[in-house]
Amino acid sequence: MKNHIKLDQELPELKAKNVDGKRFYEKQDGSRYPSITSVLSIKNNEGILAWRKRVGEEVANYVSIKAANRGTYVHNMVEDYLNNLPTNELEDKHKKKFLAYTMFTVLKDKLKHIDNIHLQEAQMYSDKWTVAGRCDCIAEYEGELSVIDFKTSTSEKKEDWIENYFIQGTAYAEMYEEHFHKSINQIVILIVTEEGTTQVFKKDKKEFLPKLEESVKQFYDWIEKNGKSN
């Protein structure tokens, strides 16, 4: 059974809104911050456009939708597992999604290291960094409070391919600290592949704070250059 920690305050509600293809989160005072995912998408934009041109729109759309659905299904299973849904109920609920359920069962070996869960699928923001986002999980991983992100992939990733994952996790750690005044240093990325393998990457947040600053600046420069408005 996973233990869930009751926090001393609730997170403020945010409203998600898409503007010019980018996601923003609106605070209760009406101001909006871009999602950290949208912020980081600017860095990859040229590569994604080149890939779509190379494979064609039809193939690109198929691959993108398949990956998004796979990720959503596995995330839902992980959330139910961490919420202590009985094994037989979890299986009955999800087993028809065969590929995703198979990937989830592989990932379970790594999920056993998660406990004392603070937040799941939590919307947060940072006034300091002027970004927002939805974090998969904040909990202890192998006994250390961590930002934990669950990723699915067709095949294994090299570490230098996934710098954005670490920057994203760093942003969530900063958001959490700003709201709850408790520091998180460890970023954990758990990847499960269609090949039946898992990868665990653990990083120190401090390593990626300069990259976060650079990414946020790059996004707002892009907004100004392209005449976009949030």
Segments from the language model and where they lie:
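Mg2+/Mn2+-dependent nuclease catalytic core
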Residues: 119-226
